[in-house]
């Protein structure tokens, strides 16, 4: 779950299964989005989904809401292991889990990464706050 008011490093990519441009705010979210796009069991991907009718929904968004090929929805939140037990992270994950359970979605999970990858790998389109992405902007 992310705070939509936070301005941070942004990676953009067009995924085949996402109807809009995919925005990732860290390397874990970016890599997992690509993995979902390549997964034959996933039919559709929505990223950074607003929590409608949730008091925190104006500011926080779920990382991934997907529709599987069997028609069932799936929700995933991306978290780095070192942030997993921080009180705010726990609070946001609980909000997300309870929100989606209230909508009848039981396939809710957390994607955990041991480490943060360097963003300096070639081929990742990067835009910084206040900067628009352009294909020539690779770090």
What are these model-predicted stretches?
Residues 1-139:
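Electrostatic, structured charged patches in enzyme active sites and in nucleic-acid/phosphate-binding
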């Amino acid at each position: 779950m992310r705070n939509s008011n936070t301005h941070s490093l942004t990676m953009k990519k067009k995924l085949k299964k996402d109807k809009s441009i995919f925005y990732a705010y860290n390397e874990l979210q970016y890599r997992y989005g690509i993995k979902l796009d390549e997964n034959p069991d996933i039919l559709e991907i929505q990223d950074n989904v607003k929590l409608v009718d949730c008091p925190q929904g104006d500011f926080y968004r779920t990382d991934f809401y997907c529709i599987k090929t069997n028609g069932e929805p799936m929700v995933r939140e991306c978290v780095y292991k070192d942030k997993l037990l921080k009180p705010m992270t726990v609070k946001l994950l609980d909000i997300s889990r309870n929100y989606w359970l209230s909508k009848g979605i039981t396939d809710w999970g957390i994607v955990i990464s041991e480490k943060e990858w360097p963003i300096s790998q070639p081929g990742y389109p990067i835009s910084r706050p206040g900067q628009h992405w352009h294909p020539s902007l690779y770090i």
